[in-house]
UniProtKB/Swiss-Prot annotation:
Organism whose genome encodes this protein: Pseudoalteromonas atlantica (strain T6c / ATCC BAA-1087)
Any one annotated GO CC term: cytoplasm
Enzyme Commission numbers on file: 2.5.1.6
Protein name, UniProt field: S-adenosylmethionine synthase
BP terms from Gene Ontology: one-carbon metabolic process; S-adenosylmethionine biosynthetic process
GN (gene name): metK
Keywords, comma-separated and alphabetical: ATP-binding, Cytoplasm, Magnesium, Metal-binding, Nucleotide-binding, One-carbon metabolism, Potassium, Transferase
Family to which the UniProt record says this protein belongs: Belongs to the AdoMet synthase family.
Length: 383
């Protein structure tokens, strides 16, 4: 029996990099509400007392960048200088310009279905049967821990919690099946008045125990709750934040490969984002169809070219049919040209701010999580 450990992490919506992601996607959503065909590439930088929003946009829409930024920071929970960041008093700098016409001519076409990819690149999609949402267990539970932290904080149940937090979960695998949790790390920002002992007890009882299944916790499971003992200075005061700096948190926690492209702030003509979503959709439907226990798909594009330059399916020896057969089925059942996948997943909508914290995958509210192709795939595979 082969045994190994695998670890994934997550961060809360109040982490500096995630603040930046959420602001970038708030800007994207506001523009898409007015102009679904807009071209947006929005980058955000946050540091003590300031937010800088930049990038390139092609649209006739007008949005109030300062108001969007302040509202986003306020919703996250940074509303007082005691937290090191305040939505109402921070400086907001706007450095957004226009997208290069050289890119436009490569993307825009007379026939919409001939729309070219907004850039070259490679993207991966992944799914596995080890959780109810067909995602790897380590990143799934890492997300749920920090999401629970935010819920408890916002409800006022633990009024000393602050927005910045991180989690990390190490699972024990036997023959590639999760059988237990070896270690849990949770660090949360807090106000100065709470003691370390109070914090550790409350985090264990109110955050960790309600989230992690008891079947995976043993007497040998190790817990590291605020292991430095103090986390008062956090958020943008503790570290600067940038859009696109949490790409492994955003995807599969390191369990699958990554093409390197970030998601937040990018409209769906950018295949870094839309094709990664399509890849998840493909992989999840293959696993949901029972055609494999684990599935990873790679898709690649050339700028200005509609057809993918490559499609490859890998099932790590768990497939009910060969990977070559699955690759053929993917080509037959999924539209992976940029225009086609945008239509397939209905991506020209303001749905992106919600993706910018707690992972883009494994959350049923998003269209790339549908398993509506599973029956057709299974039938086509003659299973």
């Amino acid at each position: 029996m082969a045994k190994h450990l695998f670890t994934s992490e997550s961060v809360s919506e109040g982490h500096p990099d995630k603040i930046a992601d959420q602001i970038s996607d708030a800007v994207l959503d506001a523009i898409l509400k007015q102009d679904p065909k807009a071209r947006v590439a929005c980058e955000t930088y946050v540091k003590t007392g300031m937010v800088m929003v930049g990038g390139e946009v092609t649209t006739n829409a007008w949005v109030d960048i300062e108001e969007l930024t302040r509202n986003t920071v306020r919703e996250i929970g940074y509303t007082h200088s005691d937290m090191g960041f305040d939505a109402d008093s921070c400086a907001v700098l706007n450095a957004i310009g226009k997208q290069s016409p050289d890119i436009n001519q490569g993307v825009d076409r007379t026939r919409p279905e001939d729309q070219g990819a907004g850039d070259q690149g490679l993207m991966f999609g992944y799914a596995s049967d080890e959780t109810d949402v067909l995602m790897p267990a380590p990143v799934t539970y890492a997300h749920r821990l920090v999401k629970r932290q935010a819920e408890i904080r916002k409800s006022g149940q633990l009024d000393w919690l602050r927005p910045d937090a991180k989690s990390q979960v190490t699972f024990v695998y036997e023959d590639n099946v999760p059988v237990g949790i070896d270690a849990v790390v949770l660090s949360t920002q807090h106000c100065d008045s709470v003691t370390t002992e109070q914090l550790r007890e409350a985090v264990m009882e109110e955050i960790i125990k309600p989230v992690l299944p008891a079947k995976w916790l043993t007497a040998q499971t190790k817990y590291f709750i605020n292991p430095t003992g103090r986390f008062v200075i956090g958020g943008p005061m503790g570290d600067c934040g940038l859009t696109g700096r949490k790409i492994i948190v955003d995807t599969y926690g390191g369990m699958a490969r990554h093409g390197g492209g970030a998601f937040s702030g990018k409209d769906p003509s950018k295949v870094d984002r839309s094709a990664a979503y399509a890849g998840r959709y493909v992989a999840k439907n293959i696993v949901a169809a029972g055609l494999a226990k684990r599935c990873e798909i790679q898709i690649s594009y050339a700028i200005g070219v509609a057809e993918p330059t490559s499609i490859n399916v890998e099932t790590f020896g768990t497939g009910q049919v060969s990977d070559e057969v699955l690759t053929t089925l993917v080509r037959e059942h999924f539209e992976l040209r940029p225009y086609g996948l945008i239509k397939m997943l209905d991506l020209e909508r303001p749905i992106y701010q919600a993706t910018a914290a707690y992972g883009h995958f494994g959350r049923e509210e998003f269209p790339w999580e549908k398993t509506d192709k599973a029956d057709a795939l299974r039938a086509a595979a003659n299973l």
